[in-house]
Amino acid sequence: ANIAEDTKATVSAEQFVRLFESAYQVDGRPDFGIRAALTYTHVPCGIGFHAFGGSPTLGDAIELTIKYKGDIAPEYIKRLDEGEFFELHYHHEREDKSSFCLLFAVVWLLEMLKINYKNPPTPVAITITDPVPGLLLYEEQMGCKVTFGASNSIRFHKSALSLKPLAADMFTATKDRNDFVNPDKANAEKGAQLSDVIKSIISKNL
């Protein structure tokens, strides 16, 4: 059977990384990670979708994501508290991918915060350990300067942990939720195009 058409098929973390690398090579554009991360915010499944849409507070959503993220992805997250701040540290199974993983995750995270929270928190700092192609594009998308340091992390004020989402139920029929669960036609068309590319890459690499 063609794994690209099998909705029950699973892939290993290494296969996932290989597929992502192949997709990046096929696309060849420096904003690939940004576009892929934003596309993920329209996927109505997974721990991130349900955690950020259905948890009672942002703190609960983060803890749920930390607890289960590593079970289904080639990276894991650690939370560190320091005074009035908290940091999310991202670690990839392949160390050379950790900085890209952090930027990809932050683009996704900030978009999910905009979707799910009336007053989404602004990062205090974003740090990476290694250069990433197209870094200026990521900074523009995230609206935050990225600095180089000893970790791949994002920092927020602890006050953000108590924020409540627009709706506790992911499928509550409010305008904001409908926009999220049912993307507009333009986004749907973009998603279909990306889906075709992904299927082609999966077929060639697995």
Where are these regions (language model features)?
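Hydrophobic alpha-helical core bundles mediating ligand binding, dimerization, or RNAP-core interactions
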Residues: 20, 62, 106-109, 180, ...
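Extended mid-to-C-terminal alpha-helical interaction segments
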Residues: 132, 136-206
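Short hinge/gating elements
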Residues: 46-51, 91-93, 180-184
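Charge-dense, low-complexity intrinsically disordered segments
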Residues: 10, 52, 96, 100, ...
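N-terminal low-complexity or simple alpha-helical regulatory segments
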Residues: 1-85
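DNA-contacting interfaces and partner/effector-binding or oligomerization modules
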Residues: 71-162
